[in-house]
Amino acid sequence: QAEGIVGGYEANGGFLLASDVTRGGQTMKALPTRDAVLPILAILVSAAQRGCTISDLIDDLPRRYTASDRLKDFPTELSHARISALSASVVDIEQTFGGLCGKVSATDSTDGLRISFENGEIIHLRPSGNAPELRCYNEAASPGRAQALNEACLSVLSAWR
């Protein structure tokens, strides 16, 4: 983690680096195009610097699991409107999703609406960038919980049509 460094990931493995990064006197220029090699190199370098295997790096990570799906034929304008309305109030968010996850700890509207809950779970809603779809991404402490949360969220979102 570094202050002022901007990077972004795609579910398909693409990575975008929007900032120059300097480390050990070497500068890597911003990479404003999708690239899947950079994350692989970062993992290999990290393992080499720590003198451990990639499996060891993975073992040090917190256990987090994701699930995602989308509602097809959901107009982009409607996605934006619904997400914007929900973003306006933590009370509204908790009324909508609190029964699933409890109290909200943080929200981020950088890319749609990412809602973090005190129990550590995450609901991230955003319109698709290339289709009339409303996407829902979830994070939880187990694969089953992530999938169940995703299905429950999609049920709630279906009522937004």
Question: Where are the language model's segments positioned?
Answer:
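Phosphate-binding and adjacent anionic-ligand microenvironments
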Residues: 1-129, 133-135, 140-161
